[in-house]
Amino acid sequence: ILLTPYTKRQLVLQVLFLALVAVIYYESRQIAIFFVAFTVLGMKNIYLKKVFHIALWVWGVCAVALSAVSFFFLEHTVYRVHQKLGLGHIFRWSLGFTHPNILHITYLMLCALIIWELEEKYGFKEFALLMAGNLLVFFYSVSYTGFGIVAVMLTGCFYIRFRPRFGIGEKLLANLVLPVCLLMSFVLPFYLSWHDISHFVEKINFLVNTRIWLAEQFLKSEYRSLFGADVSKVVKSSMTLDNSYVWCYINYGLIPTILILLSYFALLFYDTHKQRTRELVILVCFLGAGWTEQLLFNTSFKNITLLFLGAFLFLQKEGKREYCLLSGLTRRFERITVPLAGLPDQMLAHVRAVYRMRRGRILCVTAAGAVLGCLLCALVYQEPEGYVVQRFYTDGLEETSVWLETEDDPAYEGYRVMNYLDAQTPMQIVSGKAVKLETARYYVGSLLLGGMLGAAAGILWNMTGWRKKSAVAVTEISGYDK
């Protein structure tokens, strides 16, 4: 802030917002407000395209690497066992993330970054590939809401290709998303016990996995405040609040929540008026996802719409005078070179050039790696008769619980016991179709990992051989100087 030039209006807003952040933190001790504030306030003179490009590399590499490594330690990662897909109790895997739903939200953000990077190049092929990825993530997460939100965003951004400018209907639909989310977050929970429409609200509550009831549990008088409260001192339940708007209200207070929501309404109006359709689709999908998860205003780093808010906040007319407190340092460090900043793009250009020249050979090595992965899975993986997991991680009833004297209890020989603590810990048996589903998941994961390793090996092999034959081929094809 001290090194960045601002107009008078922007400087006043900065001071007011930082003062508000200090008050919220003092009242709530919620460090997440700093992440929200600095993400928005740090967007002065920052290009969205550049931020999204860097985020795509960082987020993509980290997400893929974490999921791939976690596949080898599935039983030691976070999971849930719920009745889903008509298969009885089945596993929902997070693949290294904090919850299966978060796995799908991570994929939502990755898709948004890819779409923003592709811009007009996002066509049917890219839509089909990302939708296939959506199905793959759903195969492990079994998150209905996550799958639906990703599908809506992919379809909406593909729709833009044929209708780049929205009409009244599309504009109205986009601007209704946030009001509907607020209605279901702050109004419907109070009608669960209203006799006239309670049956209707209960049906909606059932369809959305009791999220309306959960919101009602937190909309109590002890959670109300103007500038936030230390929720850890008043929470009387271990229930998880899967709602960003209610989470923001009980942690940051009424006034900051109103200011944040007004900012989003203003951004929606601006994007609609300026026909920024791609940004509008991504924005409304994340706002919709915020009703199902608390990703918007916590420390999860998944709310990329904060970058939109920051860019919107610092819109200004050209030629307006700006002021900087440390202008001397600003001139001195006007241009900062980041070492190896272009290395990922250069490596990608190398890979693309090699793939175009040796496509057939690389595809053969990829197929061989996929087959080898399946063969290794067949040799190493042994299908158990069932699984015995802690009831804490399931939605099973208490009367279906079992207790094991030891982890190697002979009564459950052939079963795979997970997260065993002691003989007093209630456990749940998972068997039947869930076992077959896990076998399929292991084979699919082995095929994909084998194919990825095969593709990497094929590219490295051909890249090494190609460099020996032609030292300038990569430069000529990729279009940059070595």
Regions found by a protein language model. Name each.
Residues 17-24, 128-142, 285-290:
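Membrane-interface alpha helices of multi-pass inner-membrane proteins
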Residues 21-63, 270:
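Transmembrane alpha-helical segments and their membrane-water interfaces
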Residues 56-74, 98-142, 147-156:
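Alpha-helical transmembrane segments of multi-pass inner-membrane proteins
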Residues 161-202, 381, 385:
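A membrane-periplasm/extracellular boundary helix in multi-pass inner-membrane enzymes
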Residues 206, 210-240, 248, 254-257:
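TM-adjacent membrane-interface loops and short helices in multi-pass inner/ER membrane proteins
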Residues 254-287, 455-464:
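Hydrophobic transmembrane alpha-helices and their immediate junctions
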